[in-house]
């Protein structure tokens, strides 16, 4: 998902580039994610774009030069995560998928996460982490079995 305005990074984006295209170690943050997905065998990508999304489309195109296939869903109004899920339902056809924010830097073993998901017979699996700055983040409450029992939106 790469549709947000990136207001908290305005000093870096200057409303000229979308937040997922902020350079990290010489290349756009979103490129790091695309490469990580490819390394994990995930090559059919759908990018949800919005504010300045044309810059993402111009950079990545159909994804061929990066060894992946990229389709786009363009938000004309911000829908949030739930809204994106709703509008993507016809594009994913009930297939297994990974959904992630385009403005995160991570090193996730997606194959391990997918195996965990399948072993648990889960409907959905969330990759979460402890957070030392809860004032600007969504928060989850988990039970002893790591099941989500509550959600507190930022």
List the predicted regions and their residue ranges:
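Short, flexible helix/strand-to-coil boundary loops that buttress conserved ligand/catalytic motifs
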Residues: 13, 41, 60, 129, ...
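Short intrinsically disordered, low-complexity coil segments enriched in acidic
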Residues: 1-4, 111, 154
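Active-site/binding-pocket entry motifs
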Residues: 6, 78, 147-148
